[in-house]
Amino acid sequence: MNTGLRRGELLALRWESVDFGLQLLTVEGGTAKNRQTRHVALNESATRLLKQWQEQVGGKQRVFEVTTGFKSAWAPLLRRAMITKFRWHDLRHHFASRLVQKGVPLNTVRDLLGHSSVGMSLRYAHLAPDQRREAVAKFD
């Protein structure tokens, strides 16, 4: 939820693409939807969780090794959490929505999500009405 990665990007992520020192992960172009490599900053929470996960899984190459179907692996967790109608993309949408609500510029949201144009990120613009008021207030 704190990275905005697509499911395929997350499942393809390798430990060598995670830089704990810089708090950065690299989504390789071959796994990205638009085929362009991008760098995603990690917040403290995501960094801490990834470090803990790395300690648990040991020397695996991929961050998340999925040996069974992805949906079947998540199903028991979702049931226990009483989450219904879950779609992986909702986590990505939540990430983008929170960024916009916190005042992050749409072009930065575009970069983090790996959208090829800011137009894709514009769907979240309605979540920041205060930014419009703040923008015109600069003329006062």
Question: Predicted regions span which residues?
Answer:
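Short, basic (Lys/Arg/His-rich) helix/loop patches that form interaction surfaces
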Residues: 3, 40, 48, 52-65, ...
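Conserved tyrosine-mediated DNA breakage-rejoining catalytic core shared by Y-recombinases
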Residues: 3-52
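Catalytic-site neighborhood detector that most strongly recognizes the C-terminal catalytic loop/helix
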Residues: 26-35, 45-47, 113-138
